[in-house]
C-alpha cells in the first residue's frame, strides 16, 4: 500500500555539486496512464498558470508566489489529495508539489483550480533536479515525503529515495529549524529512514520520548483515502519529523 514518489536516488556527492546525488538511479518508474477529462484539463488549461519547469532555473520563492511567506515542498504527491487539502487549509503558507506522473499532476491542477488556490505551484520533474537547480538554499519551512515507494526487495533498496545524499540535499534547502517530514506504511522502510537520519549531520529528531523515534500523525497531515484503506486493513503507518539544527 504505498504511493509512488517522484525523485531519483542517490549515492555519493559529485565534485561538481557537493551534496547533490548523481542522476543515474531513479526511485520511480514512469508508467503510461490513461488521462481523465479533468486531468487533461488541468494539464492543458491550469498548467500555464501554476506549472513550473526545471528549465526555468532557480527563482526566489517571493518571485514564484508574488509574496513572502513560509513555503513547504511535497515530493511525490501522487494524486495530490493531501497537498490540495493542506494548501486550502493554510492560505498563509505557500506549497510546491513535485511529481513526475501526468495523471496525478493533472488531477492536482484541476482540483487547485476548482478551489481557487493561489498558494500552490507544481513541477512535473525529477525532484532531485528541482531541489538542486531550482530551489534556493535555506529557503524552505519544510519538505514532505509521504508514502514513497518502499522498493521492498533487497536488490532494489538502492532505489529508495531516502539515502544519505538525498537528506543532505534536503538539509541545504531547509531554513534553520525547517523540517523534513516522512511517512511510510512499510515498517522496514521506516527503520531504514531512521538509520539514515540518525547518521545525517545537521538534523535532530523531534519525536517525543514516549513515541521516539516516531511521532504520532500530526493533525496537519491529512488522512488520505489511501491511508484510511490501509488502516481498515490493519496496516501501520510511521511518521518521522526531523528538524534542521544549523
From Swiss-Prot:
Pathway: tRNA modification; N(7)-methylguanine-tRNA biosynthesis. It catalyses: guanosine(46) in tRNA + S-adenosyl-L-methionine = N(7)-methylguanosine(46) in tRNA + S-adenosyl-L-homocysteine. Its EC number is 2.1.1.33. The active site is at residue 149. Pfam families: Methyltransf_4. Keywords: Methyltransferase, S-adenosyl-L-methionine, Transferase, tRNA processing. InterPro entries: SAM-dependent_MTases_sf, tRNA_(Gua-N-7)_MeTrfase_Trmb, tRNA_methyltr_TrmB_bact. Residues 1-26 are annotated as: Disordered. The keyword tRNA processing applies. It comes from the Bacteria. PROSITE patterns: SAM_MT_TRMB. S-adenosyl-L-methionine binds at residues 74, 99, 126, 149. GO terms for molecular function: tRNA (guanine(46)-N7)-methyltransferase activity. Substrate binds at residues 153, 185, 224-227. It is an enzyme of class 2 (transferase). One of its GO terms (cellular component) is tRNA methyltransferase complex. Belongs to the class I-like SAM-binding methyltransferase superfamily. TrmB family. Catalyzes the formation of N(7)-methylguanine at position 46 (m7G46) in tRNA. PANTHER family: 3-DEOXY-D-MANNO-OCTULOSONIC-ACID TRANSFERASE/TRNA GUANINE-N 7 - -METHYLTRANSFERASE, PENTACOTRIPEPTIDE-REPEAT REGION OF PRORP DOMAIN-CONTAINING PROTEIN. This is tRNA (guanine-N(7)-)-methyltransferase. It comes from Chromohalobacter salexigens (strain ATCC BAA-138 / DSM 3043 / CIP 106854 / NCIMB 13768 / 1H11).
Amino acid at each position: 500500500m504505498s504511493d509512488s514518489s517522484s525523485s531519483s536516488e542517490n549515492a555519493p556527492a559529485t565534485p561538481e555539486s557537493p551534496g547533490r546525488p548523481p542522476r543515474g538511479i531513479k526511485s520511480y518508474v514512469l508508467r503510461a496512464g490513461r488521462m481523465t477529462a479533468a486531468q487533461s484539463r488541468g494539464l492543458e488549461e491550469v498548467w500555464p498558470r501554476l506549472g513550473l519547469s526545471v528549465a526555468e532555473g532557480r527563482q526566489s520563492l517571493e518571485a514564484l508566489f508574488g509574496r513572502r511567506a513560509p513555503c513547504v515542498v511535497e515530493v511525490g504527491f501522487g494524486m495530490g489529495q493531501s497537498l490540495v487539502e493542506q494548501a486550502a487549509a493554510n492560505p498563509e503558507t505557500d506549497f510546491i508539489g513535485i511529481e513526475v506522473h501526468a495523471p496525478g499532476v493533472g488531477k492536482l491542477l484541476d482540483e487547485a483550480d476548482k478551489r481557487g488556490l493561489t498558494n500552490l505551484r507544481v513541477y512535473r520533474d525529477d525532484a532531485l533536479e528541482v531541489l538542486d537547480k531550482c530551489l534556493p538554499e535555506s529557503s524552505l519551512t519544510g519538505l514532505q515525503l509521504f508514502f514513497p515507494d518502499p522498493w521492498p526487495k533487497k536488490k532494489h533498496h538502492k532505489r529508495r529515495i531516502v539515502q544519505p545524499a538525498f537528506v543532505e540535499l534536503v538539509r541545504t534547502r531547509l531554513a534553520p529549524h525547517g523540517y523534513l517530514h516522512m511517512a511510510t506504511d512499510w515498517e522496514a522502510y521506516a527503520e531504514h529512514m531512521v538509520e539514515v537520519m540518525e547518521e545525517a549531520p545537521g538534523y535532530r529528531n523531534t519525536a517525543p520520548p514516549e513515541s521516539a523515534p516516531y511521532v504520532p500523525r500530526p493533525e496537519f497531515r491529512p488522512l488520505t483515502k489511501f491511508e484510511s484503506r490501509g488502516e481498515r486493513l490493519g496496516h501501520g503507518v510511521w511518521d518521522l519529523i526531523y528538524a534542521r539544527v544549523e
